[in-house]
């Protein structure tokens, strides 16, 4: 598991930590770290030789300023709250669709329609989402403008995590196929 994450996201240390914590609800398996590190490193190197070692989101070229550390602590706290919101929203929508007494063929249609409406207003919500994260990283927020909304790019960027949470919850919680891991990465990145 750690090797796959480290290869796909080109983050061997992240894959190691992911493998050590993902199987446990409130724990961290220390005995798994060394084997996961070896698997993650080997997976990363093999994938790197095939696909290249360039990071997905580029390199950070700025300077380190210790005065910014409290801002990163606040960002971590906000991301933690967003993770809780993501889980609560997803399960609330999923449970609501389970309780809904209509055909199981209708539920994904309704979820897909709701996701489509959100995507119509903000197309950046659909898909993997890494494209607009890259644009934000390189300070090119003007490059994504919704054809319908005329909101400033910064407002769109601030609302995207919430809209991504709602769209993911409707599309998968209604019975559609897909996963919650990759959207969670994008939500956390935004």
Language-model-detected regions and their locations in the chain:
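Alpha-helical transmembrane segments and immediately membrane-proximal extracytoplasmic
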Residues: 1-190
